[in-house]
């Protein structure tokens, strides 16, 4: 059934987005992607390559933070980037640093955060704000990332819940590991990250949080400030933001922007 569903989704991407001439003159498009849109991008990339004739050269890292593979560090070293995929606030910061074309930012999907616990562990109730507060207070350890979701956790969520003093001493920022993997191997009892980043990780259960305290962000795309293939990059961005790509994006836990 999963293979059939995937074939049906790809069948929905049948309409061409580039001309035969463009396919014949394929180029390399360098893409930097943060975790929020990575699963969707990896599913859509082969179809774009097939239809366009271009080849995608991809690298991945966190939207923020000091890790060597984080997007700000990669761009600061001068790594090539025709297209950058990340949360919109990260793209704005990168544009402010001169790494991106600020006027090219294109929203692709809404993304939300969630907690995860190891498969087989007790699944705490987070159906209400009070229940979530109690679950975080009871958790022996909590993992979060240095990227956008982690910044939300340490600067907004626990502050709004009024439990920062109690939970931050038992919370740890992990990098470069994916938070779902940290939880799956038992290094933390609970972890917070974008839903789209948690869903591909085996060995965990995802727990959604109340919308009242949810962090709704935009997974977006932008042209690199020194893009070597700007026209091909725009073709990729048009493909990722097209209605035809929406079903595959939704299948990764994101809410596509409807156009």
PLM features: what roles do these ranges have?
Residues 2-24:
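N-terminal export signals
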């Amino acid at each position: 059934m999963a293979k059939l569903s995937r074939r049906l989704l790809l069948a929905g991407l049948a309409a061409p987005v580039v001309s035969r001439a463009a396919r014949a003159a394929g180029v390399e498009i360098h893409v930097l992607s943060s975790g929020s849109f990575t699963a969707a991008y990896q599913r859509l990339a082969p179809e774009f390559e097939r239809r366009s004739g271009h080849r995608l050269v991809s690298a991945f890292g966190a939207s923020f933070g000091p890790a060597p593979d984080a997007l700000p560090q990669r761009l600061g070293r001068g790594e090539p980037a025709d297209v950058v995929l990340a949360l919109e606030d990260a793209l704005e910061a990168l544009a402010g640093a001169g790494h991106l074309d600020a006027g090219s930012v294109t929203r692709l999907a809404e993304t939300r955060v969630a907690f995860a616990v190891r498969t087989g562990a007790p699944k705490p109730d987070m159906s209400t704000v009070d229940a979530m507060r109690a679950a975080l207070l009871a958790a022996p350890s909590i993992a979060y990332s240095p990227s956008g979701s982690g910044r939300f956790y340490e600067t907004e969520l626990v502050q709004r819940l009024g439990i920062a003093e109690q939970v931050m001493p038992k919370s740890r920022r992990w990098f470069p590991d994916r938070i779902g993997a940290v939880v799956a191997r038992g290094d933390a009892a609970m972890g917070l990250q974008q839903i789209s980043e948690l869903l591909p990780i085996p060995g965990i259960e995802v727990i959604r949080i109340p919308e009242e305290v949810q962090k709704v962000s935009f997974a977006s795309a932008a042209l690199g400030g020194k893009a070597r293939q700007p026209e091909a990059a725009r073709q990729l961005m048009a493909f990722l933001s097209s209605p035809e790509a929406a079903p595959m994006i939704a299948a990764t836990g994101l809410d596509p922007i409807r156009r």
